[in-house]
Amino acid sequence: GTKRGYLFRTEAELAQQEKIWKTKATFWSEDEMADYFRQNNVRTILDLSFTKFLPIEEIRAHHDYAFKFQRKHPDVVFGHWLQFDPRRALEAIREFDRALAAGAGFVGLCVNGQVLGIPPSDPCWDPLYQLAIEAGRPIMILTGLTGIGQGLPGGKGIVLDHGHPRHIDAVAARFPNLRILAARPAYPWQDDMLAVLAHKPNVHYELHGWGPRQYSPALKKAIAGRLADRVMFGCDFPVLRYEKVMADWNAEDYSREVLEKVLYRNAEAYFAADQGGNR
């Protein structure tokens, strides 16, 4: 990734990347990163996760930087997931409205309850869920084990249960018109996540952060069966590289039809109505 947009901002955080993900940080220029996506036949949605703790003026500046990158390279960057602190909901609503009007591809909201210390089912998130419904955009909710804080004292204060699929289930029940994209394979609660997906048709599944070799047998079976039209590929760039994750997918015993659905067809269908622009 680029140095300005990189998830990890300190030397200690960069050291954690090497320890947990077994990869080293490499900083590229914007054009180099876009060329890397092209070389790997990628059209991506990037996640600006670190900005949620910043003052709103700095958040806007980072968003404008990201939007400029998307406008220059729309062939490889479909858009961005934006993260906000729900305790600053008015700021978030105003900035999301500005982002929708920016003409920089897709923009959607991402919820990371673990890092913020607020589970996704907490009512303080409700204004952002309502905002996503009104804007006609999906919302991505992270679930399962996070590498953030892993191995640090107290896990850096992160409560893993804030990423349990039960919170996605509660949100999906409370907001049946909200399009929810559960993100990460939900380890160690993969069966719980599969139950939510079976019960709540407004929930789909994106699998970044883990290669398919590490999925549970039940999840692997569901990908080729009842979830074949509702699950989609995710990488976790830059801590994971596309060439490695793609090789792992191609090594699995999936039919070409299933692989095409997971790798791009399901995402094309899911985001067909989210081609950018105003509400």
Question: What residue spans do the PLM features occupy?
Answer:
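Catalytic pocket-lining loop regions of alpha/beta-barrel enzymes
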Residues: 106-108, 117-232
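Active-site gating/metal-coordination segments in enzymes
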Residues: 43, 52-149
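A structural motif corresponding to the C-terminal end of an alpha-helix
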Residues: 36-45, 71-77, 135, 170-179
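Alpha-helical scaffolding within the catalytic cores
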Residues: 27-34, 63-67, 94-96, 165-168, ...
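N-terminal cationic-hydrophobic initiation segments that often serve targeting/anchoring roles
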Residues: 37, 70, 74, 100, ...
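Conserved, mostly hydrophobic/aromatic
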Residues: 37, 66, 99, 132, ...
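Mid-to-C-terminal alpha-helical segments outside catalytic/metal-binding sites
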Residues: 1-44, 227-232, 240-279
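Charged, low-complexity C-terminal accessory regions
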Residues: 110-115, 234-237, 244
